[in-house]
């Protein structure tokens, strides 16, 4: 809204922007993590919005960010929170990052409020890693290692192969991508190795 006034403040290593039109944006200074909320109700209320309509609305909001979406695909939709997730894909597999690199969360509530989470740092052209190929275990072995570590298997919602990002030691502008299994545990995606190690370490 061109006529609204924007207020900026710094708090706990993050920059917060608000205006009198019901918009709020928080940027974490150390990693470019962005959380944007719009309470202006630009979208009509709908208690029983269909999946088709929800995804159309979320993708329309995503396009308004004016970012390159060449490698970005729809990943999943949470019916309870009305949250749609879009991720960057490489060779058919998603990048799953705690810092939201390459991913976009778009939530449109029944009341019409909008909430977007993404990173200011977009992924550019992927380049092959110099390291040797990674040999992943089969899914049965992954599930068995989770079970043996004492994980509550009832809390696992999904398992899939994806790329884990890590900082490149030679350049701050490059991230390394390593294939691994991700487990959706308590509705949070986590590398299965971290889940196993955390559980074993808590014993």
Model-derived segments and spans:
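Preferential activation on post-signal-peptide N-terminal prodomains/segments
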Residues: 1-64
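Exposed beta-strand-loop-beta-strand "reactive/processing" segments of non-cytosolic proteins
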Residues: 2-26, 68-111, 160-188
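Short, surface-exposed beta-strand/loop "edge" segments at domain boundaries and coil↔beta transitions
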Residues: 22-27, 41-48, 91-98, 123-128, ...
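A short, surface-exposed beta-strand/turn
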Residues: 25-37, 98-117, 189-203
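Structured segments of extracytoplasmic/periplasmic soluble domains
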Residues: 60-68, 145, 149
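Beta-strand residues in well-ordered beta-sheet regions across diverse protein folds
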Residues: 87, 116-119, 184, 193
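Short helix-loop boundary/capping segments
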Residues: 107-138
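Hydrophilic extracytoplasmic domains
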Residues: 132-203
């Amino acid at each position: 809204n061109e006529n609204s006034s924007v207020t900026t403040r710094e708090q706990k290593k993050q920059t917060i922007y608000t205006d009198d039109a019901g918009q709020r944006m928080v940027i974490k200074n150390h990693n470019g993590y962005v959380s944007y909320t719009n309470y202006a109700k630009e979208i009509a209320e709908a208690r029983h919005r269909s999946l088709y309509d929800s995804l159309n609305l979320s993708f329309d909001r995503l396009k308004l960010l004016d970012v390159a979406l060449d490698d970005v695909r729809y990943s999943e939709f949470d019916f309870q929170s009305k949250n749609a997730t879009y991720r960057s894909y490489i060779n058919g597999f998603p990048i799953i990052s705690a810092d939201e690199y390459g991913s976009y969360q778009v939530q449109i509530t029944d009341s019409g409020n909008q909430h977007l989470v993404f990173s200011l740092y977009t992924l550019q052209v992927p380049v092959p890693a110099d390291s040797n190929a990674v040999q992943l275990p089969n899914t049965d072995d992954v599930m068995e290692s989770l079970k043996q570590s004492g994980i509550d298997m009832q809390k696992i919602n999904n398992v899939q192969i994806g790329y884990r990002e890590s900082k490149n030691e030679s350049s701050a502008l490059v991230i390394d991508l390593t294939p691994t299994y991700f487990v959706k545990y308590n509705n949070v995606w986590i590398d299965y190795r971290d889940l196993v190690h955390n559980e074993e370490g808590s014993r």
